[in-house]
Amino acid sequence: MSIDNLRSALPSYAKDMNLNLSSLPRITSLSEQQLWGAILATAAATKVDSVVVEIATEAKEHLSDTAYEAALGAASIMGMNNIFYRTRGFLNGAYDDQRANLRMQIIGKNGGIEKLDFEMFALAVSAVNGCSHCVEAHEHTLREEGATKEQVNDLIRIAATLGGVAQGIQLAEALG
């Protein structure tokens, strides 16, 4: 299993990440699609090749082709949006009257899956990418769509865990 491969590759100083990663598949507040889509989207957002490959391999066992593509689409579109809106946030509203002029159709179509699920992926990726504007916007939409606080918290936990795992793997690969 690919999560097991990542766990084995983590150095001893990343034991906490090892244990946190092993607990992710046991999250019960999310459906299988929500869980594995969020895991895949956040892995993609880390930009660490080995993490993306290992998680993508395992995620294919749990997701339909449409959900798999939606998770990767969420990582891609939020990679753009997080930079755009985080930067505008730095500028304290000075450019809020300007149009983004960025194509974002995948968001309107929810990647072909349920809106709630796509929003979950977008929130988790935004957490990895550190965009407070996008985290707040997607959390608001999730709550309007009926997501529970436990679900939102678990999405943040997934993002934090994959971010920490990616850091540990990157260090192990760099230092040997």
Description of each model-found segment:
Residues 1-176:
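Hydrophobic alpha-helical segments
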